[in-house]
Structures are given as structure tokens and as C-alpha cells.
Design a protein with these regions (language model features):
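Short catalytic-loop micro-motif centered on adjacent basic/acidic residues
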Residues: 26-30, 90-91, 113
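Terminal accessory/targeting
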Residues: 2, 6-7, 16, 20-28
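Alpha/beta enzyme core
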Residues: 10-21, 34-59, 66-84, 94-178
Length: 178
């Protein structure tokens, strides 16, 4: 198991805390190719900006967590090679199962998103709680999804299906408490 700090990554929650205190935003950017990854690292170096690198489900399936973590480590090495110490984190975006999140934590991701939004409320709560308990033992930040946004997430084509499944605001407080 590689802890994200061994790969040179920053804790996502710490990045958010500092950004909030100092009044700036941290970009969270998906990359789907090495060219995009290198362009992001070039921009991080040029702008001296922290970044959260998002590993999409497709990229995760294609490369796996270990290779993704090593790619990000190479970018962090490039940043350090320029004499810079800029926070970078690797985030599993839309992890659909507990095992996806475990794999990400085991191979050095500093944050994960567990997406149980397609599950009934109680199952989503249970899945999220299981993921949070595991990830927090490794100082890994967790994002969870409750409900879906109208549009692209519903149908995959950006058109929506006419039957929106917005997040129920009354469920949010209960979801967070549990």
C-alpha cells in the first residue's frame, strides 16, 4: 500500500481549508490522456496553482489505480524538479463501489468520491458510511453523492430524460448526520 503522502500528494481537505482561509479556489480537473495531464502540470507550474486531479471512471477502468497514482507522482516530481512545492491531490471521481474506493486509497489517492446516488437512500447511506470509515483510517477525504443533477448525469448525452432526480434537500441533513 502506498500512502498518498509517500507519492508527494497533498490532503484534499487541507487544500480546501487553506484556499478558504486565503480566499482562492482550487481547480479540480479531469484528464483523459497523457497530453492533457502534461498540460495540467505545465499550467500548475506556470501559474503556481494547487490542483486536484480527477480520475474519471473511464480512466480508472482503462489504467487502474496504481498506474494513475504513478502518473500523478511523475507530475509531482516535475513540479519539484522546478524547485516548487505546489499542492497536488489525486481524486477518484464517481467511484461506484466500495472496492473502487478501497483500491484508490490503497494505491495512493488522497481523496475519493463514493457515488451511491443510484441506490435507495438507506443503501447509499450504508455504502457512504462504510467508505468514510475505511478512508478516514488512512487520512483520505471522502466526497459522496446524494441524488443526481439534471442533464448529462441522467442520460449520459447531456439531454436529460425529462424525469429529474434532483437531490431532496430534506434528505441532505439526514445523509450528512449518518
Amino acid at each position: 500500500m502506498d500512502h498518498y503522502t509517500e507519492l508527494g500528494e497533498a490532503n484534499t481537505k487541507d487544500m480546501f481549508r487553506k484556499a478558504y482561509e486565503e480566499g482562492y479556489a482550487v481547480p479540480a480537473l479531469n484528464f483523459i490522456s497523457i497530453e492533457q495531464f502534461n498540460a495540467i502540470i505545465d499550467a500548475v507550474i506556470e501559474k503556481r496553482s494547487p490542483v486536484i486531479l480527477l480520475a474519471s471512471p473511464n480512466l480508472h477502468r482503462q489504467l487502474g489505480c496504481e498506474i494513475l497514482a504513478r502518473i500523478v507522482q511523475s507530475g509531482i516530481d516535475r513540479i519539484h524538479g522546478c524547485g516548487l512545492d505546489i499542492p497536488v491531490s489525486l481524486h477518484l471521481d464517481h467511484g461506484m463501489t466500495f472496492q473502487h474506493c478501497v483500491d484508490a486509497v490503497e494505491f495512493g489517492f488522497s481523496s475519493v468520491m463514493i457515488d451511491g446516488s443510484a441506490l435507495p437512500f438507506e443503501e447509499n447511506v450504508a455504502l457512504t458510511k462504510q467508505t468514510v470509515e475505511y478512508a478516514h483510517r488512512h487520512q483520505v477525504t471522502v466526497e459522496a453523492e446524494l441524488g443526481v443533477l439534471s442533464g448529462a448525469e441522467e442520460s449520459g448525452d447531456g439531454e436529460g430524460n425529462g424525469e429529474s432526480l434532483y437531490t431532496d434537500p430534506q434528505q441532505v441533513e439526514e445523509f450528512v448526520k449518518r
